[in-house]
Curated annotation (Swiss-Prot):
Protein purpose: Bacteriocin active against Gram-positive bacteria. Inhibits B.cereus spore outgrowth, after the germination stage, approximately 1000-fold better than it inhibits exponential growth of the same cells. Inhibits B.subtilis strain ATCC 6633.
Subcellular location: Secreted
Matches recorded under InterPro entries: Glycopep_SunS
Organism: Bacillus subtilis (strain 168)
The protein, known as: SPbeta prophage-derived bacteriocin sublancin-168
A single cellular component GO annotation: extracellular region
Modifications after synthesis and translation: Production of active sublancin-168 requires at least one thiol-disulfide oxidoreductase (BdbB or, in its absence, BdbC). Membrane translocation and cleavage of the precursor are probably performed by SunT.
Gene expressing this chain: sunA
């Protein structure tokens, strides 16, 4: 079981883009923004705002 877990160093976390959001989360926000809210849950405008705030 220990082999399944990877030790994450603080430097790795600091180098991640997105203020704590991962690439997959930012990609989901971008997709919601680009689709005008027709894909995924939530409105397009809120997704765009969150993407600009947390993923740029």
């Amino acid at each position: 079981m220990e082999k399944l877990f990877k030790e994450v160093k603080l430097e790795e976390l600091e180098n991640q883009k997105g203020s704590g959001l991962g690439k997959a989360q930012c990609a989901a926000l971008w997709l919601q923004c680009a689709s005008g809210g027709t894909i995924g849950c939530g409105g397009g405008a809120v997704a765009c705002q969150n993407y600009r705030q947390f993923c740029r």
